[in-house]
Amino acid sequence: MSLTVATWNINSVRLRIGNVERYLRLRKPDVLCLQETKCPDEFFPHLAFEALGYTHRLVQGMKSYNGVAILSKVPFTATTIHHRCGKEDCRHIEAALDLGGDPILLDNLYIPAGGDIPDPDENVKFAHKLDFYREMAKWYAGHKPRPRARKGLRRIAVGDLNVAPLEHDVWNHKQLLKIVSHTPVEVDLFGQMQASLDWIDVPRRFVTADRKLYSWWSYRNNDWRVSNRGRRLDHILATPALSGAISGHRIDTDLRDWEKASDHVPVMATFDL
């Protein structure tokens, strides 16, 4: 069977519900993970997703900020809401997907952006971001299967991770080395988290590291397509147990041109299980 998982920082699910519905009709992913829903749980537009067949949903939201949601056609066997760094700020939810046999664990993450100043002593938002990455690396390392385990851990992590880790994940590597999202300390911590479960960078399985690949373009760039000053902030990671199942990926760049567009576009991966 095939499983398609998409991730999208929607920058307000209620404001852009029409775009989300349009995307779901267009691509029909089995699971869509949203970040920055900016919506308290009691106001989440459940009926719209129910009508499109996404009958299994896990949401955690708050007014005006943050918020994550997993919308699925696949049943859940379990769900968890995680609180990171001692905060209940709606940044990490987890669902176990029932696909027969051992479930696939799915993490939807919205890691802090980190503000503008890349100094944790001067900027509490940046300090929070670094702490979040450290906590995730430690937490994932605690879930690593034993070397001789017969079955490896089947886990997928998606979301707006707010780090562009590779040289060609940004429009200008040298200029952005001192810009939050591409600083050496962030890239190093991203690498530590990636190493914690030997995560596979799914899109880079198909687009080699020497080629530009973006998922975000600032609203400040009026003609974003011409300037193409993008960054790859949105990621899909899979554990080695799923390596042989990875069969495709898509970044829907054209959605950045839609009316009321988010500054992020959806990233999708396909797994043949």
What spans do the regions from the language model cover?
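Soluble or luminal CAZymes and related metallo-dependent hydrolases
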Residues: 12-16, 87, 127-138, 144, ...
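Structured beta-strand-rich core segments of catalytic domains in phosphoester-bond hydrolases
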Residues: 37-40, 44-118
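Surface-exposed cleft-lining segments at the edges of enzyme active sites
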Residues: 111-134, 174-179
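Active-site beta-strand/loop signature of hydrolases that rely on acidic residues for catalysis
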Residues: 5-9, 24-42, 106, 140-167, ...
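Metal-dependent phosphoester-hydrolase catalytic domains
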Residues: 78-82, 166-273
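N-terminal, active-site-proximal structural segment of metallo-dependent hydrolase catalytic domains
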Residues: 1-52, 58-59, 65-68, 165, ...
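Short, solvent-exposed loop/turn segments at secondary-structure junctions
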Residues: 11-13, 38-40, 64-65, 76, ...
